[in-house]
C-alpha cells in the first residue's frame, strides 16, 4: 500500500480506475455553446425548458457567457442566438409574459456583450477553441437575422459584426462538412437534417450533440433515428437538460489517465482493468479517436500506445505514420495548426517503442529526433510551451519538457532547463500553479514536470524539491477537503467550448502524489 501523509493512494487509484472503465462519457461540465445549439435545433428533446433555464442561470454580470480572455465570444453568441430563437418561435408563451420579459432582457444584455466581444475578435482574432472562426461567422449571421426580424417584442440591441470566419464557413457549407473531421460542425450547415453522408456512431454524429441534433432535424424524428435520440436523451439527463462539449471523450480520459499513472510507476496490476480496456479498443484499426463519432487522431493513439508500452503491452505504431509530415506530425486530417502536445505525445510513444526494441525501432528513433528538434524550435522565449488543445501552458509544458527530457536524445538539456525555470517562476504563494488561478489540474502538471525532469537519477535540486513539495501540499489539502471530488477549476481543454475531464484531472493529481511519494527528497519536506 502506498500512502502519503495518511492518504491511501493505492485505494484512491483503484477507485479511479474502476470509474474510468465504467464512465463512457467522461465529460462532467455542461457547455453553454452546445446547450444553446440544442435549444435552437431540438426543442422537441427532453429537457428543453431546463436548457433554457441553464442559459439564464449561466449569464454573467457583464451580460456574457463563458470563460475569460476571449473565450466568451462563442458561448455568448450561442446563448444569445438560442434565446432569440426561443422568443421568435414562441416557446416562452406558455410560461407567461414575465418569463418572456426575462428572456428578452437576457438577450439584450447578451447582445451588448457580444458586440463588445466581437470588436475584440475583429482586432485580435478568434479564440483558440475548435472551429471558433466559422462558428462566430455562422452565429453572427443568425443573430443579425433575428435582430432584423418581424417577431413581436423582438430583441433590440446593437448589430454584431466580425470579419472572421466567412471563408471557412463557406467552405464548410459548400461540402467540406462531408470530411469526417468536419462533420463535427454539422450544426453550422443549413438543411443538414437526414444527410446520408453523416453516419452516427453509438448514436453520435461527429461526436457532437449539436451536430447530432442538426442531423435529426427540428421535429422529433421517427424510429430509424432511435439510437441518436436515445443517446441525446441520456446525455442531457446526466446534467438535467444541458449538454457537454462532446458526446464522449472516453478514450482521451482513459488514455491520458493511464499514461499519467503508468509514468508515475503505479503497479501494473492496479491499472490492469484500464490497460485491458484500452488495449481492446485499440485493436481493430490501430488508432483511436477521442470518443465515438470522431475520427481517429494521432494524439489519442500516441498516448494510448505510450501508456500500454509503459505497462509492457507493445502495439505497433504504424498508424502514427499516417500523420507524419516530415518535421512534425499532424493530429488530424485536415489540420491548420500543428499541436505541440500531440507531437510531444508522439515523441513519447515512438521513443518508448524504440527503447523496447520494437520492429520499427530505427524509424521511430529517427522520427523522435525530428520531433524533439521541432519542439525545441516551438519553445517560447520564456521557457514554456503553448498548445491549441488546452488553455493552460502548464499542460503543454509538462508534455513537451518530459518528452524532450526522456526521449529527445542528447543536446536537449538547455531546453529542459528553461522549462524548469519557467515552472519554478510561476508558483503561487499557496503552492499551486494556474493560468487564471491555482487549480488542481495545473498544479499536478507542474509538479510532474519538476519530478520527471529533475529526479530521474535519485537526486535532485533542493529548490525544485521544495517547489514540488509545496505543490503536493496544495494537492493534499484539496484531497482532504473534497475527497473524490477534486475540483478541476475552470474548464481548460479546447473543444468548440472549454471543457473539463474530471477523471483525467484526478489521475494527474494522484500521479503527481504517487511520483512524489517515491522520492525521499520531496516527501521529507514538511509543508503542512
Segments and roles (model prediction):
Residues 184-196:
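Edge strands and adjacent loops of beta-rich recognition modules
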Residues 8-21, 193-197:
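A short helix->beta-strand "capping" segment at the edge of beta-propeller domains
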Residues 145-159, 317, 322, 326:
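Alpha-helical repeat/alpha-solenoid scaffolds of the HEAT/ARM/MIF4G superfamily
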Residues 16, 55, 110, 114, ...:
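Buried hydrophobic core positions in alpha-solenoid tandem helical repeats
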Residues 9-14, 187-189, 316, 320-323:
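Helix-turn-helix repeat elements of alpha-solenoid scaffolds
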Residues 1-8, 24-50, 67-94, 116-151, ...:
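An alpha-helical repeat/solenoid feature that recognizes helix-turn-helix modules
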Residues 60-65:
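Nucleic acid-processing catalytic cores of prokaryotic defense/repair systems
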Amino acid at each position: 500500500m502506498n500512502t502519503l501523509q495518511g492518504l491511501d493512494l493505492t485505494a484512491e487509484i483503484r477507485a479511479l480506475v474502476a470509474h474510468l472503465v465504467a464512465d463512457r462519457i467522461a465529460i462532467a461540465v455542461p457547455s453553454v455553446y452546445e446547450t444553446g445549439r440544442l435549444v435552437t435545433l431540438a426543442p422537441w428533446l427532453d429537457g428543453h425548458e431546463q436548457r433554457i433555464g441553464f442559459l439564464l442561470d449561466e449569464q454573467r454580470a457583464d451580460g456574457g457567457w463563458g470563460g475569460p480572455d476571449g473565450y466568451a465570444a462563442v458561448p455568448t453568441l450561442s446563448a444569445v442566438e438560442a434565446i432569440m430563437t426561443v422568443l421568435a418561435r414562441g416557446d416562452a408563451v406558455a410560461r407567461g409574459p414575465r418569463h418572456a420579459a426575462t428572456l428578452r432582457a437576457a438577450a439584450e444584455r447578451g447582445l451588448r456583450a457580444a458586440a463588445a466581444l466581437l470588436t475584440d475578435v475583429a482586432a485580435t482574432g478568434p479564440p483558440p477553441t475548435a472551429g471558433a472562426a466559422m462558428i462566430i461567422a455562422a452565429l453572427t449571421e443568425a443573430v443579425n437575422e433575428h435582430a432584423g426580424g418581424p417577431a413581436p417584442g423582438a430583441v433590440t440591441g446593437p448589430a454584431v459584426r466580425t470579419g472572421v470566419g466567412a471563408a471557412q464557413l463557406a467552405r464548410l457549407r459548400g461540402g467540406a462538412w462531408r470530411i469526417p473531421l468536419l462533420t463535427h460542425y454539422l450544426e453550422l450547415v443549413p438543411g443538414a437534417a437526414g444527410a446520408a453522408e453523416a453516419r452516427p456512431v453509438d448514436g453520435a454524429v461527429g461526436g457532437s450533440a449539436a451536430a447530432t441534433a442538426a442531423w435529426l432535424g427540428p421535429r422529433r424524428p421517427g424510429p430509424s433515428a432511435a439510437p441518436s435520440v436515445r443517446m441525446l436523451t441520456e446525455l442531457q439527463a446526466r446534467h438535467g437538460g444541458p449538454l457537454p462539449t462532446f458526446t464522449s471523450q472516453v478514450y482521451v480520459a482513459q488514455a491520458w489517465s493511464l499514461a499519467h499513472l503508468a509514468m508515475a510507476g503505479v503497479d501494473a496490476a492496479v491499472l490492469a482493468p484500464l490497460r485491458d480496456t484500452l488495449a481492446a479498443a485499440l485493436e481493430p484499426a490501430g488508432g483511436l479517436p477521442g470518443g465515438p463519432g470522431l475520427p481517429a487522431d494521432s494524439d489519442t493513439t500516441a498516448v494510448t500506445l505510450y501508456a500500454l508500452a509503459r505497462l509492457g503491452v507493445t502495439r505497433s505504431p504504424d498508424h502514427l505514420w499516417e500523420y507524419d509530415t516530415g518535421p512534425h506530425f499532424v493530429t488530424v486530417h485536415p489540420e491548420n495548426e500543428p499541436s505541440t502536445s500531440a507531437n510531444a505525445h508522439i515523441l513519447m510513444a515512438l521513443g518508448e517503442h524504440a527503447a523496447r526494441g520494437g520492429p520499427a525501432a530505427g524509424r521511430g528513433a529517427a522520427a523522435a529526433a525530428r520531433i524533439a528538434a521541432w519542439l525545441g524550435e516551438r519553445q517560447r522565449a520564456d521557457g514554456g510551451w503553448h498548445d491549441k488543445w488546452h488553455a493552460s501552458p502548464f499542460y503543454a509544458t509538462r508534455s513537451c519538457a518530459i518528452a524532450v527530457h526522456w526521449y529527445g536524445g542528447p543536446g536537449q538539456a538547455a531546453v529542459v532547463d528553461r522549462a524548469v525555470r519557467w515552472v519554478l517562476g510561476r508558483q503561487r504563494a499557496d503552492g499551486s500553479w494556474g493560468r487564471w488561478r491555482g487549480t488542481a489540474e495545473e498544479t499536478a502538471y507542474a509538479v510532474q514536470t519538476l519530478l520527471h525532469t529533475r529526479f530521474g537519477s535519485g537526486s535532485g535540486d533542493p529548490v525544485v524539491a521544495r517547489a514540488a513539495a509545496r505543490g503536493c501540499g496544495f494537492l493534499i489539502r484539496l484531497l482532504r477537503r473534497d475527497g473524490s471530488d477534486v475540483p478541476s477549476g475552470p474548464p481548460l481543454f479546447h473543444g468548440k467550448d472549454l471543457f473539463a475531464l474530471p477523471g483525467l484531472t484526478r489521475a494527474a493529481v494522484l500521479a503527481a502524489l504517487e511520483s512524489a511519494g517515491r522520492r525521499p527528497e520531496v516527501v521529507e519536506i514538511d509543508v503542512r
